[in-house]
Amino acid sequence: MLHRNRFLVLLALAGLLAFLSLSLQFFHLIPVSATKNGGSSKSRKRIMPDPVTEPPTVDPVYEALLYCNIPSVAEHSMEGHAPHHYKLVSVHVFIRHGDRYPLYAIPKTKRPEIDCTLVASRKPYHPKLEAFISHMLKGSGASFESPLNSLPLYPNHPLCETGELTQTGVVQHLLNGQLLRDIYLRKHKLLPNNWSSDQLYLESTGKSRTLQSGLALLYGFLPEFDWKKVYFKHQPSALFCSGSCYCPLRNQYLEKEQRRQYLLRLKNSDLERTYGEMAKIVDIPTKQLRAANPIDSMLCHFCHNVSFPCSRSGCLGMEHFKVIKTHQIEDERERHEKLLYFGYSLLGAHPILNQTVNRMQRAASGWRDELFTLYSAHDVTLSPILSALGLLEARFPRFAARLVFELWQDRQKPSEHSVRILYNGADVTFHTSFCHDFHKRSPKPMCPLENLVRFVKRDMFVALDGSSTNYYDACHGEGA
């Protein structure tokens, strides 16, 4: 009996130790050898702190975590919120592609070992990931505008290629699509069950990461969609300016903005010292290190919780990362103050905002086509739009950022239409320059469509110099 009791005690103790070991591994408190699907077999130092509530002062690590946009708990969003007597008419969505592999490599360092195949059992997980892969395999004959028709429909390289969408990026947009589906289809019935291809407008730049992000969002929004009803148009310009891309004044603003960035960097002695330290570690000239845009690669290490690269002379570290990230935050602050980027944004964003307003006006008049519009784009697409709208407090577009324009009809006064603007789920309508003081002057709960129309058709040019009344004249005027 004594031996039996001792055996049971030892068995319970062994079970407790096993549980503690698994718990410690889960919380990254002891090293764990990763499988092929998890990355390198080496022990990896944990570099990513747990997200916390927003700190009282600007924290570069917290800002970087927001930028990573790691899929976690369900997101609280304000899309689709309106008084009960308003009817949703159309929705226009701009997205930045999801998490990607770096566009730049730090010379003389090992590339981060990130697996760009999609594995349903690997984190980050999504219940529809396996079904998404199966559906993409059925789309080999999809008819997209060239060159989109030659791009892969989902990422599939064991070692990611330059700029390739990762599994994290796919999951980010599956979640975006699922969120929009719950709000716009299940709640507001934006599209009928037998929706047609004419009711969608889909556009992507020619990068695989934007097409694949668009497809992931679309699958979350319309699971098992009919491939014959889906057509992505190709947009050659990251500004989505279509046939209105030639704009000399916009280019002048951009050149002066780039000059401002350069001068700010020269003034930052901490940044130059940090670049010098990093260059010494990897044994290259400081100028070469700076040209390699090391923050791009370091953000990939950070977002994927992989140790920063090392050489025989040492390792790049969190302090280097913090200095560069802090400079980025300071650059964004000064950018809004100097207004050069604002001038660039007004001209850069006008063509796509004009297209959006025209679609809204057609929908308001009863046109039933293009009720859901999706532009799959880049940070350099969303950032000018945010700036042009006057959203100066908006953070730089994170991975899988979304900007949504909603058009609503007042059922009590069917001729009246209103708009809502949402950025990453937050209602920013009354922070825009065209509606920031409307609620002070009117008891109406929504911003009139006319305000947005007037802003795009007139006020954007007034904000530039006041003398131009159309896009062509503004682009060929003087003012930068």
From Swiss-Prot:
Subunit structure: Interacts with B3GAT3; the interaction increases the 2-phosphoxylose phosphatase activity of PXYLP1 during completion of linkage region formation in a B3GAT3-mediated manner.
Biological role: Responsible for the 2-O-dephosphorylation of xylose in the glycosaminoglycan-protein linkage region of proteoglycans thereby regulating the amount of mature glycosaminoglycan (GAG) chains. Sulfated glycosaminoglycans (GAGs), including heparan sulfate and chondroitin sulfate, are synthesized on the so-called common GAG-protein linkage region (GlcUAbeta1-3Galbeta1-3Galbeta1-4Xylbeta1-O-Ser) of core proteins, which is formed by the stepwise addition of monosaccharide residues by the respective specific glycosyltransferases.
Catalytic residues identified in the record: H97 (nucleophile), D379 (proton donor)
The keyword Membrane appears for this protein: yes
Residue intervals passing through the bilayer: 7-27
Catalytic activity: 3-O-[beta-D-GlcA-(1->3)-beta-D-Gal-(1->3)-beta-D-Gal-(1->4)-beta-D-2-O-P-Xyl]-L-seryl-[protein] + H2O = 3-O-(beta-D-GlcA-(1->3)-beta-D-Gal-(1->3)-beta-D-Gal-(1->4)-beta-D-Xyl)-L-seryl-[protein] + phosphate
Main location: Golgi
Membrane topology: Single-pass type II membrane protein
Keywords: Glycoprotein, Golgi apparatus, Hydrolase, Membrane, Signal-anchor, Transmembrane, Transmembrane helix
Glycosylation sites: N194, N305, N354
EC number: 3.1.3.-
GO molecular function per UniProt: phosphatase activity
InterPro entries named among the record's database cross-references: His_Pase_clade-2 (IPR000560), His_PPase_superfam (IPR029033), Histidine_acid_phosphatase (IPR050645)
Biological process, per Gene Ontology: chondroitin sulfate proteoglycan biosynthetic process; glycosaminoglycan biosynthetic process; positive regulation of heparan sulfate proteoglycan biosynthetic process
Lumenal compartment spans: 28-480
Family: Belongs to the histidine acid phosphatase family.
Any single Gene Ontology cellular-component annotation: Golgi apparatus
This protein's encoding gene: Pxylp1
The protein, known as: 2-phosphoxylose phosphatase 1
